[in-house]
Amino acid sequence: MKKLLLVFILAFSHFSSAQTAKEIIDKNIELSGGLTNWKLLNSVLLQGKVILGIKDEYPIKIYQQRPNLTKTVLTINNKDTAIEGYDGVKGYAMNYATNKLQEYTDYKPESFDNDFIDWENKGFEAKYVGKEKIGNIYCYKVELIKNVNKNIYYFDSKTYMLLREIKKDETLDYSDYKKVGNLAMPFRIESSSPKKDGDYVMLLNKIEINKVFPANIFKF
């Protein structure tokens, strides 16, 4: 009887935590613009500056379009230079040894939507881990698990905005949320990694959504 009761308690706690994780994710989507508006988003142009290391600072533009097209451009010595992208077939990234854009056959493009848009249909399991503090802000900590991959998300417990995302080899901090159309988007993104070799701070001053890009914008 005790064993049966323990199994029931464990099963119920797993169910309730999954429900809680779902509620947190649903609340984030709702308060950041709503699922319909996120699904109506077809393209994004991010503009601002990126700070690399202590002093290196460059103007940056990031073009993104469904389903997974992307292009990142830095302005270096008054010249626009593509440093990374995906044209729908091939991936490209800057080879800093040769200072040339190089094709990468093993390039894995990221989905246009983040993982917690339609996470259930994508095969993820959501787990509510508990509350943790980021700075002075209490956050809901949620894990999204698929096969051996696990990402961790921290949502502000008051606003439900995403403040931190921990991937396998990168941590992203999001802040300075502003309305862009009907959507709430972060205008400050900070990336850090265990190796500290690709850390950056991106400060955006303009985000445009659903622009029609020129046909050649994703050609490299």
Residue spans for each PLM region:
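Mature soluble domains of exported/periplasmic/lumenal proteins and thiol-rich metal-chelating peptides
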Residues: 46-50, 54-56, 76, 107-111, ...
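Bacterial Sec-dependent N-terminal signal peptides
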Residues: 1-21
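Gly/Pro-enriched, hydrophobic low-complexity segments
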Residues: 138-219
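Flexible, processing/modification-adjacent segments and terminal tails
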Residues: 19-24, 30, 37, 85-152, ...
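Well-ordered beta-strand positions in beta-sheet-rich domains
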Residues: 57-61, 81-83, 101, 152, ...
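Residue-level detector of beta-strand face positions
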Residues: 45-49, 73, 92, 131, ...
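N-terminal mature ectodomain segment of secretory-pathway/periplasmic proteins
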Residues: 22-97
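Short, low-complexity Ser/Thr-rich regulatory SLiMs
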Residues: 64, 130-133, 176-179
